[in-house]
């Protein structure tokens, strides 16, 4: 019986340790550095983007081959969720917001146009903690 209790206790500990991982909190500075190392030009977000201007973790625009993306970092995942919500609330009616707005961890990405798989892979590969 003792062995069974020990085995069940060990299984419970392993199961608890293997739970769902928490969302990542990405770094503005490390993400910028990675994108620049990949040859991506960076710029400040447009002055008209008041959502990006309120991002507590920073924001910038990445100018890719045929597209660009404004990346806004929340100070936390909850803060990024708020940024995402505001973008969805204020978007123009003729914009398919679900097609151009993506959130991963604390990073909110607003694309100018539907992103290509190549651009998505580059950006996601450069999101750094």
Each model region followed by its residue ranges:
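An anionic, turn-rich surface loop/hairpin at beta-sheet edges
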Residues: 50-53, 81-99
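C-terminal motif of bacterial Sec signal peptides marking the signal peptidase cleavage site
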Residues: 14-17
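Positively charged n-region of N-terminal signal peptides that target proteins for export
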Residues: 1-4
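Short secondary-structure junctions
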Residues: 36-51, 91, 128-129
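A short, solvent-exposed beta-edge/loop patch
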Residues: 91-129
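A short acidic-to-branched-hydrophobic micro-motif
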Residues: 62-81, 107
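Bacterial signal peptide processing site
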Residues: 19-21
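Secretory pathway targeting signatures of secreted, lumenal, and periplasmic proteins
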Residues: 46-68
């Amino acid at each position: 019986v003792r062995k069974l209790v020990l085995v069940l206790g060990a299984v419970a500990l392993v199961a608890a340790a293997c739970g769902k991982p928490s969302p990542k909190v990405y770094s503005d500075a490390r993400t910028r550095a990675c994108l620049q190392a990949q040859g991506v030009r960076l710029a400040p977000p447009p002055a008209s983007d008041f959502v990006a201007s309120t991002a507590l973790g920073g924001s910038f625009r990445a100018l890719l081959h045929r597209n660009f993306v404004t990346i806004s970092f929340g100070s936390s995942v909850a803060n990024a969720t708020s940024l995402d919500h505001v973008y969805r609330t204020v978007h123009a009616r003729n914009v398919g917001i679900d097609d151009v707005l993506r959130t991963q961890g604390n990073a909110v990405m607003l694309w100018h146009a539907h992103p290509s798989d190549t651009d998505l892979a580059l950006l996601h590969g450069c999101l750094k903690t």
